[in-house]
């Protein structure tokens, strides 16, 4: 049941990754062993992409929690997976401070501090893929990209990805950093049956061969369990192919573009098993067209961030 692979830059990774953010939800603090087991099960099944971030934590004073958890899971793994094939990605650029004060800081010094902290939490000498989390509206976007390039030039990171970008921001990043050969290798944006506004970004990534990692591919934790009732066609097609609505969503996303690599979250090993199963499902052209024709709610998981900050 090993999932097929797709490319992120010069690397091949499983076509379905594991979004690790839910493992650091406050409700998971008393289920640490289960969190570790969830990552271990993903590795057992051939998942070679783990996505984390410095701000994924149960509280503001535990920043780095998710990175440390992922590092522990990798360090304690004794299963059959070849860990030399594993890609652990993290992010920087969003701040989370005293009393849950959220902000953005992509100044060069702040990005360096964040990357250095992530190196320590992950227990590595270099970050294989570092993703710029969100545009800092106080700074020119090109300047933020220069900061990322400096991290790469200085050997803190190997590859650069973007997150939560619009088409204009992506094009600026490409101008500064270059394309997937030696510059921008991935884009991580929201994309799901619920939210599809970034189709133009996906199209650009498909054109250039830049990996597109849709976050919250099932519409977020609050909607994932009932995605089949909110978007009935995913349940209908799922019945036709012997899959759950959630598995059908992942199969549909994979069929949208050869650069698509969903990163669904999980807090139980069984959920990872379902995601990996979805990577092997095949949709007919007619089924794919029905799913694509379904109407999105078009509401972001984080509506306060829309419309996006103006490009400066």
Model regions and ranges:
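N-terminal binding-site loop/beta-alpha segment at the start of enzyme catalytic domains
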Residues: 1-83
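Acidic (Asp/Glu)-rich catalytic clusters
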Residues: 10-12, 44, 73-87, 119-123, ...
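Short, well-ordered coil/turn segments that N-cap beta-strands
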Residues: 11-16, 46-48, 80-86, 124-128, ...
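Active-site mouth loops of central-metabolism enzymes
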Residues: 21-33, 98-109, 133-139
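A short acidic, helix-capping loop that chelates divalent metal ions and anchors anionic groups
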Residues: 24-26, 56-60, 95-101, 220-224, ...
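Short, acidic/polar
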Residues: 30-43, 106-122, 170-171
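Active-site groove signature of glycoside hydrolases
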Residues: 119-138
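Beta/alpha (TIM)-barrel catalytic core signal, keyed to glycine-rich beta->alpha loops juxtaposed to Asp/Glu
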Residues: 135-312
């Amino acid at each position: 049941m090993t999932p097929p692979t797709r490319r992120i830059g010069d690397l091949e990774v499983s076509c379905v990754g594991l979004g690790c953010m839910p493992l650091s939800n406050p409700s998971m603090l008393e289920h640490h062993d289960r969190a570790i087991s969830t990552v271990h099960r993903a590795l057992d099944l051939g998942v070679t992409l783990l996505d984390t971030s410095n701000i994924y934590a149960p509280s503001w004073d535990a920043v780095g929690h998710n990175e440390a958890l992922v590092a522990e899971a990798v360090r304690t793994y004794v299963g059959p997976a070849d860990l030399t094939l594993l890609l652990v990605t993290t992010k920087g650029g969003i701040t989370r401070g005293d009393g849950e004060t959220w902000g953005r800081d992509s100044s060069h010094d702040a990005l360096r501090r964040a990357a250095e902290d992530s190196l320590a939490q992950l227990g590595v000498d270099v970050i294989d893929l570092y993703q710029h989390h969100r545009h800092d509206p106080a700074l020119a976007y090109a300047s933020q990209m220069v900061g990322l390039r400096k991290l790469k030039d200085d050997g803190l990171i190997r590859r650069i990805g973007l997150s939560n970008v619009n088409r204009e921001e992506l094009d600026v990043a490409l101008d500064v950093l270059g394309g997937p050969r030696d510059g921008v290798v991935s884009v991580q944006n929201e994309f799901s049956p619920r939210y599809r506004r970034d189709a133009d970004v996906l199209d650009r990534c498909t054109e250039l061969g830049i990996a597109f990692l849709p976050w919250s591919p099932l519409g977020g934790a609050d909607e994932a369990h009932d995605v089949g009732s909110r978007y009935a066609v995913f349940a209908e097609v799922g019945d036709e192919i012997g899959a759950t609505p959630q598995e059908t969503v992942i199969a549909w996303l994979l069929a949208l573009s050869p650069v698509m690599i969903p990163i669904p979250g999980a807090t139980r090993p069984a959920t990872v098993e379902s995601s990996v199963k979805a990577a092997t499902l095949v949709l007919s052209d007619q089924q794919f067209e029905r799913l694509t024709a379904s109407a999105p709610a078009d509401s972001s998981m984080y509506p306060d961030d829309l419309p996006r900050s103006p490009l400066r």
